[in-house]
Amino acid sequence: MYHADLHTHTIHSDGEYTPAHLGLMALQSGIRYLAYTDHNYSYSPAELSDLRLQFPMLRILRGCEFSCFYRTADQRRVEIHIVGLNFDPDCPEFQAVLRRNQPDRRSYVTKILNKLDALGVGIGTYEDLMAFCNGPQHLGRMHIARSLVTHGYVKTVDEAFDIYIGSFGQRLAYVESELDYAPIEDVLSALQKAQGIAILAHLFFYPLDDAEQHRLLRTFKALAGPCSGMEVYYGRYTDEQRCHLAALAAQYDLLPSAGSDFHGPGDGNATHDGGLGHHFPASVYEALEARQREVYGVVHD
């Protein structure tokens, strides 16, 4: 039986593995449909062509996880993530959003590092963190979490988020994002113009109560149009959470999507052995692609 994973990360953003290594893991895990969805990064045609030549048994999909901002009813600014699939990478509106979503992260990351240092759990400077992570294009909290593990302050990446840098939990060194990402309206408009699939990622990760979750879903559906979905099958979610998300997806006419959000073996979204072996049904992707063909008459490679 084939499987799908439509939400993964590599060293192009905050993942631990190269795209080729991730492709090999997917192949060994029985995955048929694999989307590389690095943060605010679009793979070049040459990169995808090389990966498809290496892994002809995989259906490798063009993807990107967009950061964007959403305004709540009380005008709070909440960072939301949207997975885009099978879009036209040459669409001018898409390119404009991608350029907008490349802010300088030094100030934001440095503020977190300074808070950690004040707590006595210092992991060095911005330059030290860059060196530790081998100069990634997208330096962020996942890299800080791994450094906290390496320095022995916490045992796992999840513990680093729960105690220090996550949006929930103790938030001892949490810093509100100041990065100037595009608003949700611009991201979803760009994905429609690029004839892509828009998927609302990990609904339970956002600091929203039930009423605001429903408001976000209504807004997302209205802006995303018919070629849209939301993550129902997700790495760390329980069966009960998935059932709840499936009901919400049906209520708002959003197709269910499936993604591990895999970053590496120390990630809470990895399988028990640190791998990429979540058995999400391939039919989930096939339904998304069928909707894209119905709406746009094309599936972009």
Residue ranges and their predicted role:
Residues 1-79, 166-170, 179-267, 287:
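An N-terminally biased module of ancient metal coordination in phosphate/nucleic-acid-related enzymes
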Residues 15-16, 106-114, 122-211:
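Divalent metal-binding pocket/active-site signature
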Residues 21, 32, 39-94, 100-107, ...:
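Mid-domain alpha/beta scaffold segments of enzyme catalytic cores
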Residues 28, 118-120, 273:
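Intrinsically disordered, low-complexity regions
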Residues 72-104, 146-172, 273-296:
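Active-site gating loops and adjacent loop-to-helix segments of metal-dependent hydrolytic enzymes
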Residues 297-301:
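A short C-terminal boundary segment appended to hydrolase-like catalytic domains
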